[in-house]
Amino acid sequence: MNKLDFDISKLPEYREDNCLEVKKATNGLPNSIWETYSSFANSEGGLIVLGVEEDKKHQLHITGVNNPDELVRDFWNTINNQQKISLNILTDKMVSVHTVEDKQIIVIEVPRAEREMRPVYVGTDPIKGTYRRNHEGDFHCTREQVLAMFRDASPITIDSRVISTMDFSVFCLDTIKDYRMRFNAKHTNHVWSKLDDELFLRRIGAMGLSTEDNKIHPTIAGLLMFGYEYEIVREFPQYFLDYQERMDPSIRWTHRVTSSSGEWSGNLFDFYYRIINRLTTDLPVPFQLKNNIRVDDTKLHEAVREALLNALVHADYYGRQGTVIIKSLDTLSFANPGDMRVSLKTALEGGVSDPRNTTLMKMFGLIGVGERAGSGVPSIIASFLEAAHHSPTYKIHFSPERVLCTIDLNKETQDGVDKASDKLPIKEETSDKISDKLQKIIVYMQGNSGVVTQAEIAKMFGVSDRQARNYLSLLLNDGKICAVGANKNRTYTLNIK
């Protein structure tokens, strides 16, 4: 919440939440204000309102502050004292005095701190003085959370770091071979294709020169992309990749792939290609033709691939609980460890690219995965909105930090039909549009052994069952198709004369 979203005249109607904190502060600044300042700065930002009290029923009451000018002066003196607060991220306009119900209150707008400024903490010890905010209020960050903020504050993404304690032997040669085959298919006659494996890996950022011994060693990105799981966990003890299919509610999962199984390498590259086809199987496919050939790859497929890649390249692999992808009957979910490096609002709006692992993103891009401009959350949303009438949902969790993307496949989409579609009226269409659809039905049947069902036609055009029957009736009347069977089992075949 910011001042633009906040209507001071309606203050008593608000409730404290993850972005609004009220404090009585009648005669002075409460000590807890600095914990809230830290928590908002390290979370999504928020408003602190002084001169307001919350009762036991969580109702807000305006009590006002005495000597607001003195309180504002004390506030600025304290926030600019680095013995009290690590960093002042406010501007003059973010602190203001207002009169409500003939009483004066102070409104302090705390923005989300840029990752380079985090953590923002109280006192001089970041481990003891760093806070974050959730719906229950301010909470003290663990050592693990504070160290994660320091990692993200670095101007250089961590996956470019060279691991001088490892050598070429940590890599799975089969993974490298598979990657190079895909690279060569994408880049015909590329100069890198003639290099040996070690030089090739240096060119793509998987290996680099160590400043410690002046020798070539794997980078973090190279280890994650091509390494064996048992080597990866030496650097990332919490590393874990988990894909689950939950297609039967009576059992925990119907299919599972984990990086720790020992049945395959356990690295990111192999994980992506082990699960991507299973992940996109059964997604609704609309009827589309390109050069009279049916197109089976949709914007929904594109969004799912982007979501999987996003989870893998934005994960903090030092974080807990691993990267977990779940496919169920009606949803797909993608969860990865680590906070977002920009605010959720900024990520959703796009325009700012700040990946946690830029080298990993580059390596996937070199083989055509996630290479499009604007790749990321906005791209996922745009692709999904084009394929459906709703957006994926994104949530940020703390303790531990995780980002969760959920795609709901159960809502009505352009690629499918509503479950109550038989009750929908027949749409009025021009004769040209109807003729075009009838021709598409014939072309579809020619490529489908000459057979089609009413349900397929409804799904093909995203129309009601009644509308689909209407198209088929027109073709029947023209003698172009024949009906076989009755009611639910009825199919339609081409009338070959």
Report residues per predicted region.
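Conserved N-terminal catalytic/coupling substructures associated with nucleotide/phosphate chemistry
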Residues: 1-301, 306-415, 463, 470
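Short amphipathic alpha-helical interface segments
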Residues: 175, 434-451
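Short alpha-helical segments that sit at the start of domains
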Residues: 414-442
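Alpha-helical and His/Cys-centered functional microenvironments
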Residues: 418, 458, 471
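Short acidic, hydrophobic short linear motifs in intrinsically disordered regions
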Residues: 450-460
